[in-house]
Amino acid sequence: MDEADVIIYDALISAEILSLIPDGKEWIYVGKRSGHHCVRQEEINQILLREAKAGKNVLRLKGGDPFVFGRGAEEVECLAAEGYPFEIIPGVTSALAVPAYAGIPITHRDFASSFHVITGHAKEGQKNRDSL
């Protein structure tokens, strides 16, 4: 966070984490919750590009693993297409962290040899999967 000029952050970032941001940083809130997007994903991508083009060191702060239903792939694809370097420092997805925190194994050689993580949300304009 010390090296960032601007922090673009989501709704899932706790107040405790936000309190670690040093003074003098620009903050841009782009939080989304299911059914309520204060900023659409396409606009978030454009904000990332705008700040990078302005020569700023941008920190995109997301909860969990940005590549597990976090739209991280869309964001880095946008940056890569324009030739901007990026670094991913993933957190732990809640699909793994919550059961572990509760002492519930996700796999166990006597009971479960695999697990699946499936979103319950369809892309806008598409139907939810009936198989869920």
Region spans (language model):
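Class I S-adenosyl-L-methionine
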Residues: 2-92, 97
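Short intrinsically disordered, low-complexity coil segments enriched in acidic
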Residues: 1-7, 111, 127
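Beta-strand/loop-alpha-helix module characteristic of Rossmann-like adenine-cofactor folds
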Residues: 77, 86-87, 93-132
